[in-house]
Each structure stands twice: as C-alpha cells, then as structure tokens.
C-alpha cells in the first residue's frame, strides 16, 4: 500500500506499507480460495482499513490481480474485504495490470524516445510491456508467477538442478508464443519491477556479481548458488527476507527463462510498478485526464458511433438526471459519467448485426481489453448497454458491485428513456420534461400538446411501459 498526497501537481509518497499474504498459495486445484488464506487476506484488509477508512470516496484505489481473477469464490470474500477496507476493490484484467505497471515504471524513466521492455513478476502472473516514453505499445500478461511457479516445482522447499530446469522450461513454454514480440531486437533497454526482481538485484549486488541491476553473468551465478544450497536458508542467504523463501525459487526460474528466451544481457531495476501506476492513474482521474474517456472515444471511433446522436442523448440524460436525488454512495457526477459512456456506446453492436445489437454491444464491452476499466467496470458498462432496449433484464444488476447493484436499475431506466426519446434521428431536440421517479414508479410529464404532435413517441413509450412492467416498474406519461 502507498499513501501519497498531491503537492504542486506532483505525487509525494508519505508512507509505504507491505504485508506478504501470498494469496495465490491458497488457491486450490479447483480454483477456490481456502478459508485460511481468505482470513489472512481479510486480516490484512482490516489493518490497511484502519489507515484508509477515513479517507473520502474517490481518493483510494485498491485492485485485485491474478489470483482474484482466477478464484471462483472471490465474490463473497471481495464483499467482506471491501467492508474491512472501507473502499471498493476492483479486479483488473491482466492487460490492464500491464498498462498500469508500465505507467508506474515509466514515471522514473527519461523521456528519450527509446523503446524499452518492462517486466513485472507477480504471485500468479508475469507482465511484459514494450513502450516508448509514457506510452505502452505491446502488452501481455502470462499466467505464471513466483508463487504459482514455486508451488508447482519447489513446493517442499527443495531445489535441485532437475527441478529448476523443469521450472525454466515451464516458464519458457508460457513465453514461447510471445518471444518474437518481446525479443531484445525490439527494444533498447530492459527494466524490471516487482519484489522478486528487486530481491534478485539485492542478492547480486551484495555478492559483487553485478554492480547495478541484473546481468546475465550474475544471474547465472546466483542460480548456481541457489541450486547448490538445496533450499533457501538464512545462513546461505542472509540478505533474503525469510518471507520470500517459499516464492523466490519460482520467481528466479521465470527471470532465468526470460533472460534466455529474450536474449537479455542486462536489466535495470525500477522502484515503480503497479501501485505507482495506480497513483498516477488516480491523479489523472482527479485532474479530468481520465484514460477511460480516451478508451470510450476510441471505441466510438472504431465502431462508427454517430457522435452527434450520442451528444443529443447525453443532453437529454443531463436534463433528466438533474431532477433526481442522489446519495453519498453514488453522486450525480459519477452517475452522469457512466450513463454518458453507455449512451456513447449503446449501439456499437450494430457493427456486428442489427438484430440483437444491444446484446452484441454488451458482449464487446464485457470481453474487450478496455484500458482504465476494471472487470467490474466493464460488467457495469456492458449491463447498461445490454439493458438499454427491449426486455428489461433487471436480474443482471444483482451481479454488479455496490452501489450499482442497488441503484443501477433505476439509472438504467433513465438511460432507456433518453435513448427512446431520440429513437428518431430526425428529432434533434427534446422539450423540457418533468421526471418523477422512485424504485417502482416513473412519471414523465411533457409540455402541453407535444405528445399529440409526436404519436410515434407515444407508441414507443407505451411499448416501453410493457417492457418495464415485469420488472415491477410502472411507467406513466402525459
């Protein structure tokens, strides 16, 4: 955990807290988190929560990575963990993790226009990114990490030449399909992030095997020393934190495989990684430089969205939302932002087929790599788009994270109405409409005579009332 504040538009780190939970070590072959590891992680969230619970919403970002992506039973634990922490916890995709890692690392590197490789070893995944300056160009997240690799090949702590070779081969097999993308021919500088790589540098430096960073010669000597020791211990490796004993051999095998496959001669080490990337991403959101907005606009361009039509829907949304009361858990600005994004992207599915285009659009949004969006974010956006027309799938909102699981249904109805009112592209302006709304009642009041002049809108609203009725929502208008 990193605690920081903004001074003169610069991030100043105030405190760093770290606890070794090794969540991946508690993942069973059936992809369930054991009760013991759940409790250990929950206890950690309680301790972190003491520091963070008093901070205002929007000032904290907490993310879960590979293990929470893989675990089948992460949902109930996540709910308890968010309560303990006092803030939402987002599960992010591997590609999004890679983007954030690069963002964190690149802040400490010069803007020299040179291509660099960034590598980060986590507990259950390893990320590789090639980028220039602040821009990532190629990103991959491979399902191998220091914890998972150590459990698979060094579970009892014993290290031998045969075991280590098998671990290196296993890592090479994961890396093989992407070897050509990240080979040393593709970049000028290799940079490592994460505790495993920093620990490796520390071991090499203390032994005089590498003056700075990780050299291939020093790495080979360290691998031999680890194998000769037979198992990690304090007497042979006094610089190594005992908490890292269980996970370090697997991480070292991943480093060895990477150096061999990509023909790396030397790698420098960065202090920045995922947490620093999250800080800079959060700063961007605060300063209205939200990468999610760029992602939405890129999607809109890719799927040929009619920008003028989307803006008209957003204007009507704005008028309707201004008449609603909002709570502390979901403020007007946040609700408006999400509904604006959904309005922009609501018909991207037409690029696949007109029939069922709301379902096609939802599939794209749920499964595409969307920079800046967590898994829960993508599910929310997909649900809003899926529910914008035809039968109202109220049950989908139960799977959303708070507060959208409770309030999302009503706001989705507002989105439906705004889109419905602009169903005719010829109708560029909607008159002032009075909206009354609660969980089960929606009442629209139009200016006198307007509905009589727009019989198609009346027919659309009558049909909409039929769609909403099974969800126990009564729509009336006049």
What residue ranges belong to the model's regions?
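C-terminal structured domains
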Residues: 461, 470-471
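A generic, well-ordered mixed alpha/beta core segment in the N-terminal half of proteins
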Residues: 115-125, 129
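Active-site cofactor/substrate anionic-group-binding motifs, chiefly glycine-
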Residues: 11
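Helical "lid/coupling" subdomains associated with nucleotide-phosphate turnover
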Residues: 3-8, 21-22, 26-55, 67-73, ...
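Short amphipathic
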Residues: 16-19
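A short amphipathic beta-strand at an alpha->beta junction
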Residues: 471-478
